[in-house]
Amino acid sequence: MSNDDQLKVRQTVSKKKSFKELTIVRDIIFWIDLVGEGQNENAIFARPFNEKEAFPQKLTSKKYNIKNNFHGYGGKSYKCIYLKNNFYLIWIDQITNAVWFQIFKEVASNYRSQKRYLDSVQEPRQLSKSIDGNFDSSFVISQKNFLYGICEINNRDYLFSLNLKKTKQDIYRIKKFKNFAGELSSNTSVSLLSWVEWDSPYMPWEKNDLCFAQIDLDGEITKIKKFSDKLINAK
């Protein structure tokens, strides 16, 4: 949990309030905002969804540049997953060029102060070593404490995993994609992964293939299948 409580939050003093990279998990809103005066200093904030006048709680310190450069055009730079009664906050940091995460628990409503809605269960951890490439933020966490994601290294996309119990680890490359990939997702039990693949000159919203794969007990993927429907895939 950050102790930089005195840092100015620009969003709170702006006449026109806006949220950047908005996420809603349960009754908590998460977003990104600048801190300090530098354009490369930002943090993740949170507040209750139904309390518009609640003062934002800053969840990450100013030492991160939370940004997504995946495939050159980026996207959302963090993800929050509610798992095992906790909030798993995962973000991409451009200073270390690595994946970080922190675990929070929700403060009971009758104990919430004006500025505190989530308590840190675990201090921030740098999950991955720095990579010469970019991460996507469509992360998935399994019940076995593995994080799955997609990254690009040397202009090739990979499905990878990280052990949530370890720090500063090499990414474990599970699959090398033939073309571009993104939008990683899973079913509730995280026994099935899905993602989309596409090839140039198309963008993913123009033409793509939806793929599925099962995850075995060791975290490896098996039985990769491409979704096929003559009507949907028709040119």
Where are these regions (language model features)?
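Blade/loop signatures of beta-propeller domains
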Residues: M1-D5, Y158
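Beta-strand-rich domains and repeat architectures in extracellular enzymes and scaffolds
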Residues: D4-A46, K76-S77
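Conserved beta-strand position repeated once per blade in WD40 beta-propeller domains
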Residues: E21, S77, S137-F139, E183
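Residue-level detector of Asp-centered blade-edge/turn motifs that repeat once per structural unit
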Residues: I24-R26, I81-N85, S142-K144, T188-S189
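A flexible loop/linker signature enriched in serine peptidases of the S9 family
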Residues: D33-F45, K63-G75, K84, I90-W100, ...
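Short loop/turn segments that connect beta-strands within beta-propeller blades
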Residues: P48-K52, F104-V107, N163-T167, I215-G219
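Blade-edge beta-strand/turn elements of extracellular beta-propeller
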Residues: K168-K175, E220-K230
